[in-house]
Swiss-Prot record:
Keywords: Chloroplast, Membrane, NAD, NADP, Plastid, Plastoquinone, Quinone, Thylakoid, Translocase, Transmembrane, Transmembrane helix, Transport. Its EC number is 7.1.1.-. It catalyses: a plastoquinone + NADH + (n+1) H(+)(in) = a plastoquinol + NAD(+) + n H(+)(out); a plastoquinone + NADPH + (n+1) H(+)(in) = a plastoquinol + NADP(+) + n H(+)(out). Signal peptide: none annotated. NDH shuttles electrons from NAD(P)H:plastoquinone, via FMN and iron-sulfur (Fe-S) centers, to quinones in the photosynthetic chain and possibly in a chloroplast respiratory chain. The immediate electron acceptor for the enzyme in this species is believed to be plastoquinone. Couples the redox reaction to proton translocation, and thus conserves the redox energy in a proton gradient. NDH is composed of at least 16 different subunits, 5 of which are encoded in the nucleus. Belongs to the complex I subunit 4L family. InterPro entries: NADH_UbQ_OxRdtase_chain4L/K, NUOK/Mnh_C1-like. It is an enzyme of class 7 (translocase). This is NAD(P)H-quinone oxidoreductase subunit 4L, chloroplastic. It is found in: Plastid, Chloroplast thylakoid membrane. Pfam families: Oxidored_q2. The gene is ndhE. The keyword Coiled coil does not apply.
Amino acid sequence: MLEHILSLGAYLFCIGIFGLITSRNMVRALMCLELIFNAVNINLITFSNSFDTQQAKGEIFAIFIIAIAAAEAAIGLAIVLAIYRNKNSTRIDQFNLLKW
């Protein structure tokens, strides 16, 4: 059972990395980043439950990661919305505000 859950987490992580590398849309890149965070949460909770069943350290870290991911998503979507208002596009290759 442990191997199946860890392979699910690794599979989700790989899908997130692939999507993050190949996406040209900022919203899709944020979604892939959230998928990576969720894969880390799955593996963290799995390791916590399999190695230390008495304490809930993995679950506490997972809740902390979920809170950080929610803040990251809110800030990221606010940035995407501001860029869309200025450029009328959410494509990553058209985002050149930080270039010289």
